[in-house]
Amino acid sequence: MLFREATPTDIPQIQIVRHLVKENVLSNPNLVTDQDCLEFLTIRGKGWVCECDGQIVGFAIADLKEENIWALFIDPKFEGKGIGRKLQQIMLDWYFSQDKSYVWLGTSPNTRAEQFYRKSGWIENGKNGSDEIKFEMYKDLYLKKQCC
């Protein structure tokens, strides 16, 4: 497996992975456009991918402008292999090196993602919208978890 920074040429494969997921499914696949992905990768933040045999099997994108994790998705065939954990680590290491001390994300309740974030030490802090759980991570908490 190869972990690397995402580039605009990765967007078609990123979109494929995004649409393969079984949980946190987009109600309308057209809601997240290639242009949205490009903006988040090149203007608002940065992204990373995991490749296996030349195919992208997971990706993560951080949004500096809104101080949130815009996306972290793994092809369901590759879940449980540590890809999400590694992408999260790469992303948060970079994010907190950008003079940021706080980041949040939203995810649907009763999903593998919810359990992943809880296990990773994210703190639940209310709702994001009407149905998503809002999780937060703080730089000092993250760094403490990394060293101990």
Task: Map each language-model feature to its residues.
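Conserved active-site alpha-helix within GNAT-family acetyltransferase domains
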Residues: 85, 109-126, 133
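A short beta-loop-alpha structural element at the N-terminal edge
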Residues: 1-16
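A short, internal acetyl-CoA/4′-phosphopantetheine-binding micro-motif in the GNAT/acyltransferase core
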Residues: 72-80, 107
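A short helix-loop-beta-strand connector motif used in the catalytic cores of GNAT acetyltransferases and
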Residues: 38-49, 68
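Conserved beta-strand in the GNAT
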Residues: 49, 55-63, 68-73
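Conserved acetyl-CoA-binding loop-helix of GNAT-fold acetyltransferases
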Residues: 80-93, 119
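Conserved GNAT acetyl-CoA-binding A-motif
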Residues: 95-108
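Conserved GNAT-fold acetyl-CoA-binding loop/helix
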Residues: 15-42
